[in-house]
A protein has these predicted regions:
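Conserved P-loop
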Residues: 41-107
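Charged, amphipathic alpha-helical linker segments immediately N-terminal to NTP-binding catalytic cores
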Residues: 1-3
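Conserved catalytic network of the ASCE P-loop NTPase/AAA+ motor domain
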Residues: 21-23, 49-52, 94-97, 123-127, ...
Length: 160
């Protein structure tokens, strides 16, 4: 199987269909549930789907070490590659790692403007963010102002 088939058969296609084409640049989506129900797994699958489409992804984690998130990407990619008999899996994996940035922020010191400042610094350094995943941010920290800041950044940067 080639990478395009992974894109075509991704569960993200069902999400896109259910949401009339999925998120577009400048839009944000919020996924919430109780702790331990698989949000990170879903977000990593969304991230992998974007990476398979040669998009640059920044995964911001608030509740785990960066290596934990990297392990999620590794495990899900490995399982997909095995189940789908992905040709050139090591080349695809190397390409994914090059296009992915994982950042870790402290939940207690959360500031949307601090995260956005970091994303802008990455862009100034040549690391464009096509897709932004924010994982583990407690819902009481994501107030209307913070959500508006992220939406404004997404629109300005052309980020999903």
């Amino acid at each position: 199987m080639v990478k395009q088939e992974l894109i075509d058969r991704s569960p993200v296609r069902f999400l896109e269909k259910a949401t009339n084409g999925g998120l577009q640049a400048g839009e944000i989506g919020i996924l919430t549930s109780k702790k331990g129900l698989g949000k990170t797994s879903v977000l990593v699958q969304i991230g992998l789907d974007m990476l398979f489409q040669d998009k640059n992804v920044v995964h911001v984690s608030f509740n785990q070490q960066s290596d934990f998130v990297m392990t999620w990407y590794e495990d899900i990619f490995t399982e997909m590659a095995k189940k789908k008999n992905l040709t050139d899996a090591s080349d695809v994996k190397a390409d994914i790692v090059r296009k992915r940035v994982i950042l870790n922020f402290n939940q207690d010191a959360f500031s949307a403007s601090h995260v956005i400042k970091t994303l802008k610094a990455l862009a100034e350094g040549g690391i464009k963010t096509d897709g932004l995943i924010i994982d583990g941010l407690e819902t009481d920290k994501l107030n209307e102002t913070a959500a508006a800041e992220f939406k404004s950044y997404a629109k300005e940067a052309g980020t999903i």
